[in-house]
């Protein structure tokens, strides 16, 4: 190793931004998520909607990737993808999924566990029609997760579809869609001094939500 390599064991800082107390909690987890989301938006966090999505393949091997959250409400959280992608293939045989929001600037993170269900065509078409035209073209151009020789291959395919759809609206590809994550549990983490972080977990039960504090 280079003598001037970074000593990562000594990289640390104290988390002193805020506390999370039981009195701060809401009855429903999505209400607290919306509050934190608005606070993150007010703080102008970069890439606010970026979320890490974890799935597993048929051998149990986990995979993660970053996607963009496109909607959330009491019914769950929504993201869109190529239905031939690795994540979509995983969800086809195991719909269990985990989402992670890393809002480092606010010393916060949110972890979601749930089940992903494919969106109805009408909802997908409504969102696809709102995308910028180049994003619509890229949905056609990329066979997500497949092997390609060079970036030039991808660009060439993009230009081909850009020319093909040069007039009128870009249609929705049959292989493109979205998922709604129906939430079973949601954990809220607020960094604390001396590593005494605040963690609360909401878990769905028959009568609503059970809320517990977790040790850091």
Curated annotation (Swiss-Prot):
Q: Which Pfam families match?
A: PNP_phzG_C, PNPOx_N
- EC nos: 1.4.3.5
This enzyme catalyses:
pyridoxamine 5'-phosphate + O2 + H2O = pyridoxal 5'-phosphate + H2O2 + NH4(+); pyridoxine 5'-phosphate + O2 = pyridoxal 5'-phosphate + H2O2
* Cofactors that this protein relies on: FMN
At the top of the EC hierarchy, this enzyme's class is: oxidoreductase
Keyword Hydrolase listed: no
Q: Which Gene3D superfamilies match?
A: Electron Transport, Fmn-binding Protein, Chain A (2.30.110.10)
Which Gene Ontology molecular function entries are recorded, alphabetically?
FMN binding; pyridoxamine phosphate oxidase activity
Q: Which UniProt keywords apply?
A: Flavoprotein, FMN, Oxidoreductase, Pyridoxine biosynthesis
Q: Which GO terms describe its biological process?
A: pyridoxine biosynthetic process
Kindly indicate whether the keyword Oxidoreductase belongs to this entry. Answer: yes
Q: Where does FMN bind?
A: 65-70, 80-81, 86-87, 109, 144-145, 189, 199
Q: In which pathway does it act?
A: Cofactor metabolism; pyridoxal 5'-phosphate salvage; pyridoxal 5'-phosphate from pyridoxamine 5'-phosphate: step 1/1; Cofactor metabolism; pyridoxal 5'-phosphate salvage; pyridoxal 5'-phosphate from pyridoxine 5'-phosphate: step 1/1
Residues that bind substrate: 12-15, 70, 127, 131, 135, 195-197
Comment on bound cofactor: Binds 1 FMN per subunit.
Q: PROSITE patterns from the entry?
A: PYRIDOX_OXIDASE
Subunit details for this protein? Homodimer.
Family that this chain belongs to: Belongs to the pyridoxamine 5'-phosphate oxidase family.
Q: What is the name of the protein in this document?
A: Pyridoxine/pyridoxamine 5'-phosphate oxidase
Which organism does this record belong to?
Baumannia cicadellinicola subsp. Homalodisca coagulata
């Amino acid at each position: 190793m280079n003598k001037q390599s970074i000593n990562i064991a000594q990289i640390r800082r104290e988390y002193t931004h805020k506390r999370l107390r039981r009195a701060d909690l809401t009855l429903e987890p999505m209400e607290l998520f919306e509050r934190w989301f608005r606070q993150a938006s007010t703080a102008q966090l970069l890439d606010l909607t970026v979320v890490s999505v974890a799935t597993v393949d048929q051998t149990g091997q986990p995979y993660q990737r970053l996607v963009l959250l496109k909607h959330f409400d009491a019914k769950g959280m929504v993201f869109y993808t190529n239905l031939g992608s690795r994540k979509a293939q995983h969800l086809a045989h195991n719909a269990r999924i985990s989402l992670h929001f890393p809002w480092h600037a606010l010393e916060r993170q949110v972890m979601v566990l749930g089940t992903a269900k494919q969106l109805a065509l009408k909802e997908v078409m409504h969102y696809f029609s709102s995308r910028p035209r180049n994003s619509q073209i890229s949905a056609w151009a990329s066979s997500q997760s497949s092997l390609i020789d060079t970036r030039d291959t991808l660009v060439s395919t993009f230009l081909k579809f850009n020319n093909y759809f040069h007039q009128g609206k870009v249609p929705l590809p049959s292989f493109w869609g979205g998922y709604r994550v129906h939430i079973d549990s949601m954990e809220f983490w607020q960094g604390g001094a001396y590593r005494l972080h605040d963690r609360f977990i909401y878990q769905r039960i028959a009568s609503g939500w059970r809320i517990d504090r977790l040790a850091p």
